[in-house]
């Protein structure tokens, strides 16, 4: 490409990125927003759904995709669930009327978190090491004092949603690498085919189903997927076509059930836990996952917590009956 054309292309890209950051900052001027003080680690994550990458290939560094600053935005809690309130009657991730500067600072923190998440995933796809120096360069050195909080949010995102965690490889060089974190005991085939474990995404989907009363409508599931940057008919650069994934692949694996709502006319569809999900995880584990996303404890969600406890008690009784039955059979087999 001639030098002049390349220069113009870079200029257009910079203008496009500036417009995107302006939108993320709620219409404020990017130059003014950059001067705002970033919020403390106690600030809640924004809940606005992100945009997916422009194409299905490996995203380029210049493609500023927006990731949710916390996967909590993907788990849509039912408003009728009285347990979704904190001890003071508030949602665990609610907050009281932030000032304009606080809101702008929080949006900027979310933007920087999204940029770092994109960078980490690029490195994982390319199987390249990650250095602290490179991460600082991505977020801009002027935010060095906020790097620990941005890194914490970013690593939480990739751990929960993508099933990856950041492992230190060389302390002297401050070099790291993303590695898979397997949460399901029998998930050898639970992968997107490109090396990304699906356990994190699956936990988000199972959480959505459980928090909606053990069955989630197709609309509720797509609201969840949209919050993760996954849209119907649009190929995701990691997971491929989302509809194929949730209605066929995960159903075939036994993790989800996809069925028509009884007596619905016109037909409507819903998602339930599949037999493999029921065998490999539990309502309590999923509820603890939801609580972790919202920086609270499982008992905060009273009705769901009681339901999860009942399931644990029933499973404990079933195991006790099975053990007693096995002992009785063994005893009879040794009788003359």
Swiss-Prot record:
Residues 1-17 have a biased composition (Basic residues). It comes from the Eukaryota. Residues 90-103 have a biased composition (Polar residues). Residues 39-54, 62-80 have a biased composition (Low complexity). It holds the Pfam family MAGE_N. Residues 1-108 are annotated as: Disordered. One of its GO terms (cellular component) is nucleus. One of its GO terms (biological process) is negative regulation of transcription by RNA polymerase II. Residues 109-336 form the MAGE domain. Gene3D superfamilies: MAGE homology domain, winged helix WH1 motif (1.10.10.1200), MAGE homology domain, winged helix WH2 motif (1.10.10.1210). Disulfide bonds: none annotated. InterPro entries: MAGE, MAGE_N, MAGE_WH1, MAGE_WH2, MHD_dom. PANTHER family: MELANOMA-ASSOCIATED ANTIGEN B17 (PTHR11736:SF88), MELANOMA-ASSOCIATED ANTIGEN MAGE ANTIGEN (PTHR11736). This is Melanoma-associated antigen B17. The gene is MAGEB17.
